[in-house]
Structure formats: C-alpha cells, structure tokens
C-alpha cells in the first residue's frame, strides 16, 4: 500500500467538499467494520486472488416474541439486556441444527411501536400495555455449517456497499425453534398472551395454542420479522490464504503493510454480542503489530 486517497466530507459526514486528501504511512490499518472494510478493499481493488473479500459476512439473524405479563415489568427502565441464556446455543454442537442465544431486550416506545406491527386502535391498546410487555429475542449463530454461509458485501453502482444475505432453510428451521423456545419460556413465566413478531402471528393465550400455531407459520422473507445488530466477517481470517483475506494476526495475505483490525476478520459469527471480542482481538493484534514495526 503506497498511500490512501479520499474525498473530504463536510461536517454532516455526507456532503462532498471537493477536497482530496492523500495520506502516506509505513503501515495501514483498515478498521471500518464488517460492511465498510470489505467495501473499502473492493473499491480499492486490493489483490484478492481467491475471491474472499466480502464473502462470509454474518449478521446473527434475530427473531423475537412479545408477551403481555400480569405484572408491570417496565421494559424501558434499568440496565438493558442484562438477562440472557445460552441453553440453546451449543446444545446440539456447533455443526448440529442452528443454535441461538436468548436475550431480553429493552422495549423503548419508539422501537416497540415498530415491532408491534399494529395500526389504529390495536396499536393504541398495545402501547398502553407497554409497562406490562416483555420481549425475548434469539441471536441465531450463523456460519458454522455449509447450509449457513452468511452473506456477501458487494459494491453498488454508486460505490456504496450492499449486503446480500440469503436466508436458507437451515436458518428458517432455527427461527421456528427459537419462536417456540421463547414462547414457552414466556408462558412458563406467567404471560397472559404471547405473539411472535411475524406478519401472520396472533396473540396466543396458551402454550398449547402457541405451539400449534407457530408450527404452521409460513417462514419466508417479508412475513417473518428478522433483525440484526451484529455485523461480522467479510474479511475473514485464516492462515490459509485460500480461505481468508488476512491471517490470524490480522495481516493481509497479499499486501505486507496492510492489516485489518475489526469484526470483519471473524471467520464465523460468534453467538454472542461481539463488542468485547472485537476489543480483545484488536488489542492482541495491534499490540503484536506495534512490536513488529521498527521505529
């Protein structure tokens, strides 16, 4: 890498100023995350003899269920997502059916009004019941079997990054089992009614009713509501250049003075909120890099 050239943007982060900036350095670190780092390398035409840049981008597909509890739970107060369960995460091994981590997210009014998937009087009723509302979500760990290859980052005609992510039958099976696990847990906790976040989902008033109905829900795009908050992969690490963009130290296989230090180097998803893992891996690799570069 001989240098970096970029267009300076205005204070809003979007408007071009017409100013071009070139930076030269002994070593360059890309740390744009699982979408922007692959996009940067693709736009820069970084050597990619094995076509790995942008592949195996993982998102932890998320689905959720919403319950009305008899007592107030005030889901918008307190430390968010402080309760979680890994019971279903590795129960069948890494290569068995898709595992998932269960979490209890906060339910702020703005977010809630969107996930309730309701209008008019129905939405008013559900918002009025928000103090009694509990939500559970499942982080489905993608990337551990061939049936779950993740997505691919590519560059649109205007130069912006696009993520293509196909939801396979393997993932849909995990979505259905997660719906069932969450609904069962909510009824066990005393829920008056439970509804999956699905356009065909209804309020179910018993576990028996929910189990039968969820088993019949059509699982396909634009019917089941899927979310993500975690982006990983796209510049996966492997000490085999045919399988990774960088090695396990984050060093690029083809360009000796380029490193990638962010979540894009994950070779799979990790089945957990990745913030601390990104911090730890980056701290390890940047420390090793600093020792290897002579002043």
Name every feature range the model reports, one short phrase each.
Residues 1-3, 11-81, 262, 281, ...:
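Glycine-rich loop(s) and the adjacent beta-strand/alpha-helix scaffold that form part
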Residues 1-10, 191-268:
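A glycine-rich dinucleotide-binding beta-alpha-beta segment and adjacent secondary-structure elements
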Residues 267-287:
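A conserved FAD-binding loop/helix module that cradles the flavin
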Residues 41, 176-179, 183-187, 286, ...:
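Non-transmembrane alpha-helical segments in soluble domains
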Residues 50-180, 184, 222, 228-231, ...:
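FAD cofactor-binding and catalytic pocket of flavoenzymes
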Residues 32-33, 174, 229, 249-252, ...:
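Secondary-structure capping and boundary motifs in well-ordered enzyme cores
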Residues 46, 184-197, 292-295:
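Surface-exposed helix-capping loop/turn segments at secondary-structure junctions
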Residues 39, 147-150, 246, 269-270:
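Cytochrome P450 core scaffold surrounding the K-helix E-X-X-R motif
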């Amino acid at each position: 890498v001989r240098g970096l050239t970029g267009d300076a943007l205005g204070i809003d982060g979007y408007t071009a100023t017409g100013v071009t900036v070139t930076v030269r350095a002994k070593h360059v670190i890309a740390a744009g995350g699982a979408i922007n780092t692959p996009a940067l390398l693709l736009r820069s035409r970084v050597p990619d003899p094995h076509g790995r840049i942008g592949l195996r981008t993982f998102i932890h597909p998320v689905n959720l269920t919403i319950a009305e509890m008899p007592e107030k739970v005030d889901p918008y107060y307190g430390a968010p997502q402080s309760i979680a369960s890994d019971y279903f995460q590795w129960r069948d091994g890494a290569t068995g059916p898709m595992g998932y981590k269960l979490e209890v997210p906060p339910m702020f009014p703005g977010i809630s009004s969107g996930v309730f998937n309701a209008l008019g009087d129905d939405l008013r009723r559900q918002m009025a019941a928000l103090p009694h509302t509990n939500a559970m979500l499942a982080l489905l760990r993608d990337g551990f079997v061939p049936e779950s290859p993740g997505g691919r980052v590519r560059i649109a005609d205007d130069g912006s990054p696009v993520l293509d992510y196909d939801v396979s039958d393997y993932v849909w099976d995990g979505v259905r089992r997660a719906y069932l696990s969450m609904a069962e847990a909510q009824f066990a906790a005393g829920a008056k009614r439970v509804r999956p976040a699905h356009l065909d989902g209804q309020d179910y008033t018993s576990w028996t009713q929910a189990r039968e109905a969820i088993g019949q829900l059509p699982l396909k795009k634009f019917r089941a509501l899927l979310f993500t908050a975690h982006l990983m992969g796209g510049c996966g690490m492997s000490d085999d250049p045919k399988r990774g963009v960088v090695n396990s130290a984050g060093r690029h296989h083809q360009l000796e003075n380029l490193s990638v230090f962010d979540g894009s180097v994950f070779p799979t998803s990790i089945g957990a909120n990745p913030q601390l893992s990104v911090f730890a891996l980056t701290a390890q690799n940047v420390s090793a890099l600093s020792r290897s570069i002579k002043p």
